[in-house]
Amino acid sequence: MILNGPGISYTEPDIGAEFVPPLPEHPREAIVKLCEHCTNRLLHRDELLGYEYWSFAEAATDEQAEVLCKMKMRRPYTLPEMVKLTGMPEADIEKMLDDMSYTGLLEYNWENPERAKQWVLPMLVPGSAEFLNMRVSQLEEHPVYAKFFEQASKGPLSKATPMVPPGGAGIGMHVIPVEKAIDAASTSVPIEHIEHWLDKYDGKYAASTCSCRASRRVMGEGCADDPADWCIAVGDMADYVVETDRGHYVTRDEVYDILRQAEDNGFVHQITNIDGENKIFAICNCNVNVCYALRTSQLFNTPNLSRSAYVAKVEKDKCVACGRCVEVCPAGAAKLGQKLCSKKAGGQVPEYPRQELPDATKWDHTKWSPNYRNDNRIETHESGTAPCKTACPAHVAVQGYLKLAAQGRYDEALALIKRENPLPAICGRVCNRRCEDACTRGRVDAAVAIDEVKKFIAQRDLDAATRYVPPVVTPTRAGGFDQKIAIIGAGPAGLSCAFYLAEKGYRPVVFEKNEHPGGMLTYGIPSFKLQKDVIEAEVEVIRLMGAEFRYGVEVGRDVTLDELRAQGFKAFYVAIGCQGGRLAGIPGEDAVDVTVAVDFLREVNSGKIDTLSGRTIVVGGGNVAIDVARNACRLGSEHVEMFCLESEVQMPASEEERREAVEDGAHISCGWGPKEIHLDEAGRVCGITFKRCTRVFDDEGRFAPEYDENDLRRVDADRVVMSIGQSIVWGDLLAGSKVELGRGQGALADPQTYQTAEPDIFVGGDVYTGPSFAIDAIAAGHEAAVSIHRFVQPGSTLTIGRNQRRYTALDRDDVVLEGYDNASREVAHVDREREKAAPFSEYVETFTEEQVRAETARCLGCGASIVDPNKCIGCGLCTTKCAFDAIHLDRDRPECSTMVKYEQKLPSLGKYALKRAIKIKFGKK
């Protein structure tokens, strides 16, 4: 053999190489022979690979290796036969066999008429490579086993994959669909049902560690799942894994619970596929981000290595592009597209490309997908999908919850919203409605009143009897995770992060320096827009999910990060928002009657200011300035006027916000910048002078105001509120940390993971982006929860295989909109009498049920899921997520249920390879 042969990476990262030492100058001869004996010879390799050598060298003594070399692979031997084969005393050989079984070099069963115990030298995969990885303590002591498994499940297949026929040719594993996805399929055969195999091995089940999850975790590419108890050994294999400390017996009900939890998490059911149609020895529940069996089809783009006899199909009329099937699809077969007709497609719904297959095409590494774990998570086709879902920073399934609301399924609608937005009642009142700006219906008449429908749905959260508390969906069989996570700041980003961590099975602790949660939602937004009981109700849901809230605690002052680390906290999410304001740097601004907007709003919302007299001047033109002006009007200020640099067209505040401010009595003067604040003899504000702003931005669009110093305007004032920007007040929070700060003192972090230069500190919301909207912070908190979950689970990658969140909107100029009737947009009733009686209470009413029905009927239903049958592996997970009965499995590929024994592999490959060669030669499809 050639020594120091290379590992095979196939353009994937060569992970785990650090666990493979250089081959010794004089390798152990017995181990070299064992490598030759056990290695799959399909490649006809003659090199000695380091990961093979060191794995066998650490697993076997020379004497054990010599015994193994005398055994034929997959041929069972009874104890008398092993005595005869080796010439060893019975007691000695039995102990050696049991020792090698415990290590994982051998397996055993009782598959003979006498039910005598017999030992088997298994193939590498599935076989000894898994067994070596299934006991965590052993794997941690011998991490080279992880590299061995990773390579042994890939390298031998590289040349064979295009020749694998439907059914898999006795190689590896085979997808078996979710039972309820095919339970009504009259054409199904028994081996396609999990129930068939559970019946066959009734009473003999054991739950064991997932070797793929364990292997990837050791090499730093774990998926953050707890590896324990996801794989179900059946029959004699159940006894083997229990007796060798790889698992424990479980009842049939416990098996059902494992299967249900696997489906909830989006794990694919697979069965072993090396013993023909009359035997399996395991049912695995696989995460495509780590599973080596699923990798065989996904890396090489050869689905025959995995797929079942079934293909998912979408009923477009029922589909609402909610994206649930897309998120869960392990093969990237389901993607979001459109169902509106396209001008470019000749007035028809566009057709979508299909994955090329090796059946009639020459296949080499250029056809592979080394980045499949990320590529399979791309959510939309390039041509785009529903603009509402795309435009929403949290990518809420707008089209989906509109349809559920139209059907009166309000609980399900609320559940769907909360998959991406845990604060829908809040957002129904204060969101800046980018979904409506993007709504295709706006090209017909007016955008659908999406936010008003969401507000109606989310009203259920305000009542303990109807609120929706999501169930915990956790990738651990232990019921949840015990790692302690601290969230600093109970604003929208922190609340969102707490919600999604709790949903994942954590019990995060939220530290809030104020006495109430919500951050700027509570202390910044006027109560006539957002009642505080709405915030409390949605926070209560998060508390019921398992989050703990500690109020009146300022991290950095009352407790430090290091002290929290000493208390066992493993990660921190810093989301303290922009709590300070900025001044203009002009004379007189240090007077007592000059304040910044965030301080003014905080005092109003805390009840410290309950009346105002005199004249109030607000400097600034954004939505926060509008809030200040409207509060001042309602508090009784005699004259309220806003001054901003921008023209009316350029003003950051929305047109709706400006209109409401004027209705409240505020005046708006555009094109003015502050020059000087005037004080009387007592040092109190008596006026302010403005100078004409002639230009706000330079030619590159950068903020660079220019003024006409000769065009001045002085106005009387009793107080001035500066609303020209916000600042971050860090205090001593980051003292001693490695967190780096950038422009405006914002924290620097990775744009996808939000991890800072201090690995256990993640940031989000306004401390990362600067002042933004609640929905942006909510989206950031969700992504941070994903990152933190991965961070605190040992050996997990923060990036590989996470949903990309790269949604693309369809081209609204391309869709055919002729033929749609105009339908007036519903408008929420404004109760002016209530507003007069209680100016700081909400006065905009929620839609009625009739209005919801009318408004949801206006949705054009732009998007739909598209399934590529060439990529679909028929797992059926998509069917478990769809709330609209819009996606089903059809038995289009019955030949994929052809299960043959491993020993028939070469004839099966040869027969199919001949057919394929003929197709390639003659160009047949």
Where in the sequence are the language-model features?
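A Rossmann-like FAD-binding core segment of flavoenzymes
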Residues: 533-582, 595-612, 634-744
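Short acidic, hydrophobic short linear motifs in intrinsically disordered regions
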Residues: 74-86
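Glycine-rich dinucleotide-binding loop and its adjacent helix/turn
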Residues: 457-478, 504, 537-557, 581-635, ...
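A short, conserved structural fragment
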Residues: 101-112, 334-335, 887
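Short, amphipathic alpha-helical interaction segments positioned at domain boundaries
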Residues: 115-154
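Ferredoxin-type iron-sulfur electron-transfer modules and their immediate structural context
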Residues: 33-35, 56-57, 196-199, 203-320, ...
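Short amphipathic alpha-helical interaction segments
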Residues: 86-102
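Beta1-alpha1 glycine-rich phosphate/pyrophosphate-binding loop at the start
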Residues: 396-399, 405-406, 447-451, 487-555, ...
